[in-house]
């Protein structure tokens, strides 16, 4: 017997080997080793509990899809995706929408402590009786094959987004509980108040469209308030966002994810939520933008992060995060307005400098997203004390003038609030200022045109130390950043692959969102290229893959762009004996 069991938890995913042998007449005729963990996972009416502790699920949906090869990616790529979810995006859960996914992916979730909601395959359609019998068989096979994975906390036993079918779904729930009475069942639907036969009411909540609240309260969705409730999808098709969309669109995409996360965090009886989705993916003719690509991800197809990815990664504490929603180029904004600029960070504070002059120190309490551990913080001051220090005005007049100019920058001339006009009237009456005076000051302190280049610097501060710095200034030089998932590959039960993620950056490490130049690939040695030899970056991002060919040795991938030059990545390939 196992003594003093170490429980499996996200922060300490302790695993055990279970060795099983089959004996006949004193002779062992078969044996196997399974890896599993010990934990108690359960849903209650007020949320999800792991080992007796309440845990809010914050996850993303994942398709098992890759550029050029579809679902035919080996173990290394499955592992890579799990690592991205946990270590880059900082989520604590994933939904394998809408089918069971690679054992290699789920095994990696076991190893790194990533919680999993998995379900049997299907989407909206329910067929005839023969079809239903096959669906039940699919469910049986899924549970038998996957039930030893401690990361799996919920079985999906309803065809995703299908209509109610009580006879069918009573059977799927019966089978699931018969084969595994330790896990709850759920059933993803887009229907409110539908027939609840599962243990958990799981619902795709697409209420938020930029105007409506981030989510429905539980009472408006589930027919039984005593049963647990979970949001299985949100956003996604409500606001498709391409990497090469303009800055305002990309920012709105990120803020919508923050809106939903914040709304869910304010509802104590919602177990958690899964955003749609982890990355963009190939799709059928009815979706996409005429190119059969769903731009629903917080990452692009190659797993390069969009701005929205930072909303998730900023909720973890292990890695410093600081992303600016803006390049600080006024020409990217209609009318030159700088409204809607955000700092997405997990820092305690962010110091903002303009041409080495401290403008303002922002704190996490300045975020309107009070329910999040680290909500996005609006940039609402471009002036600081500059007018007080540089203009021949009375201190109070200078401060009022600064407020006026910041309001103009934040709201834009066509959306100014009533308090702006009251403030302008006060400056005119009390200090005899004229509109042309304000225009001149705006040009000097906010507009940034006709003067020397403006350099903005943002410092993320944690525990009194600067942990990350972002600099925004007019781009002088572009270069390619290349990130390779692994340089050592192994030809084993299948070919092996390496993901190559590419971004065009300026000299300060900022993504060049409109660098859509061609990039050429050349492979030498024991590797093959997956995909075309030439691509065009989209939104300054792209990628490729290389694969093994059955041979051991060295391989070289050359990446070339006419503007940035060549980069060579070297690989070593071994064969598994």
Task: Map each language-model feature to its residues.
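Secreted/periplasmic carbohydrate-active enzymes, especially glycoside hydrolases
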Residues: 1-100, 107-108, 113-116, 138, ...
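Substrate-binding/catalytic cleft of secreted carbohydrate-active enzymes
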Residues: 81-87, 93-341, 356, 364-366
């Amino acid at each position: 017997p196992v003594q003093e069991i170490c429980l499996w938890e996200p922060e300490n995913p302790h695993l055990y080997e279970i060795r099983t042998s089959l004996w006949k007449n004193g002779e062992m005729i078969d044996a196997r080793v399974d890896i599993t963990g010990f934990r108690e996972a359960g849903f209650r009416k007020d949320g999800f509990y792991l080992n007796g502790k309440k845990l809010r699920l914050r996850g993303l949906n994942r398709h098992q899809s890759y550029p050029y090869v579809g679902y035919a990616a080996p173990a290394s790529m499955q592992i890579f995706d799990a690592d991205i979810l946990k270590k880059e995006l900082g989520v604590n859960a994933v939904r394998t929408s809408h089918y069971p996914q690679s054992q290699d992916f789920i095994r990696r979730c076991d190893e790194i402590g990533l919680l999993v909601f998995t379900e049997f395959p299907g989407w909206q359609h329910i067929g005839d009786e023969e079809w239903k019998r096959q669906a039940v068989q699919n469910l049986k096979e899924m549970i038998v094959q996957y039930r030893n994975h401690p990361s799996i906390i919920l079985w999906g036993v309803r065809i995703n987004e299908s209509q109610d079918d009580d006879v069918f779904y009573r059977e799927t729930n019966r089978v699931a509980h018969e084969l595994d009475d330790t896990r709850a069942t759920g059933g993803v639907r887009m229907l409110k108040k539908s027939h609840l036969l599962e243990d958990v009411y799981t619902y795709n909540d697409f209420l938020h469209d930029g105007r409506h609240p981030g989510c429905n309260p539980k009472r408006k969705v589930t027919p039984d308030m005593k049963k647990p409730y979970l949001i299985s999808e949100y956003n996604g098709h409500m606001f498709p966002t391409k990497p090469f969309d303009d800055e305002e669109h990309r920012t709105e995409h990120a803020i919508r994810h923050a809106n939903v996360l914040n709304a869910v965090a304010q509802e104590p009886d919602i177990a958690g939520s899964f955003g749609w989705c982890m990355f963009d993916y190939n799709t059928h003719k009815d979706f996409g933008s005429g190119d059969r690509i769903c731009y629903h991800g917080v990452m692009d197809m190659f797993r390069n992060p969009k701005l929205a990815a930072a909303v998730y990664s900023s909720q973890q504490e292990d890695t410093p995060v600081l992303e600016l929603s803006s390049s600080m180029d006024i020409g990217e904004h209609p009318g030159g307005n700088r409204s809607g600029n955000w700092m997405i960070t997990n820092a305690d504070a962010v110091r903002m400098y303009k041409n080495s002059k401290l403008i303002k120190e922002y704190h996490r309490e300045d975020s309107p997203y009070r329910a999040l551990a680290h909500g996005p913080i609006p940039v609402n001051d471009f002036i600081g004390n500059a007018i007080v220090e540089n203009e021949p005005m009375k201190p109070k007049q200078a401060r009022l003038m600064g407020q006026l100019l910041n309001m103009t920058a934040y709201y834009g001339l066509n959306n100014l609030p009533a308090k702006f006009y009251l403030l302008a009237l006060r400056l005119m009456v009390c200090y005899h200022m004229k509109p042309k005076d304000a225009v001149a000051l705006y040009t000097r302190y906010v507009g940034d045109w006709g003067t020397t280049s403006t350099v903005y610097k943002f410092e993320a501060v944690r525990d009194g130390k600067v942990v990350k710095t972002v600099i925004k200034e007019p781009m002088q030089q572009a270069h390619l950043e290349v990130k390779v998932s692994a340089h050592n590959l192994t030809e084993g039960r299948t070919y092996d692959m390496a993901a190559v993620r590419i971004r065009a950056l300026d000299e300060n490490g900022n993504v060049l969102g409109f660098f859509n130049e061609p990039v050429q690939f050349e492979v030498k040695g024991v590797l093959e290229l997956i995909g075309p030899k030439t691509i065009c970056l989209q939104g300054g991002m792209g990628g490729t893959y290389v694969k093994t060919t059955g041979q051991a040795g060295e391989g070289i991938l050359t990446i070339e762009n006419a503007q940035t030059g060549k980069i060579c990545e070297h690989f070593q390939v071994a064969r598994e004996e």
